[in-house]
Regions:
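Hydrophobic beta-strand residues in large extracellular and virion-surface proteins
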Residues: 16, 86-89, 97-99, 110-112, ...
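Surface-exposed, charged secondary-structure patches
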Residues: 46-105
């Protein structure tokens, strides 16, 4: 894999993590009463759907965002560019790449594919530092 591809993959994952973190911060601005309002839920769903469509492959994600709304709280965001750092980028086969990140207690692996000359995140896996096996994680 050349340096340009590596840089593109790095920027894709970092930008995705950053935008998801901003979305999580936005969601935390609402109190419980506001979150129960249909218009608030619609706006939150619309925002995350826009991020997913910008950075991820177009596929149905029944158990993942934007269909299943969840987000981390301040101090324990699901996506935090200050805590999640890229440690490895590998090409698994033509047009498929693994971008591995690390936080304080786990590894995350973003599976990126190249489709129609565009790089998109297809899925994500998780592995705690003490584990040997990757498990499916939701975007």
């Amino acid at each position: 894999m050349d340096d340009i591809t590596k840089k593109i993959l790095e920027e894709l994952v970092i930008d995705f993590i950053s935008e998801m973190n901003e979305w999580e911060k936005y969601c935390n601005e609402f109190d419980e009463d506001q979150l129960e309002l249909d218009e608030t839920e619609h706006k939150i769903k619309q925002m995350v759907a826009s991020i997913i469509s910008k950075y991820c492959t177009d596929q149905e994600r029944k158990m993942s965002r934007p269909n299943a709304l969840s987000w981390g709280l301040e101090g324990s965001y699901d996506y935090d560019p200050n805590k999640e750092k890229i440690i490895d980028i590998q090409e698994s086969r033509k047009n498929k790449f693994f971008v591995t990140t690390r936080t304080d207690d786990e590894y995350l692996q973003y599976i990126v594919v190249k489709k129609n000359n565009k790089y998109l995140i297809d899925s994500k896996k998780r592995k705690f530092l003490s584990e040997d096996k990757w498990s499916v994680d939701y975007l």
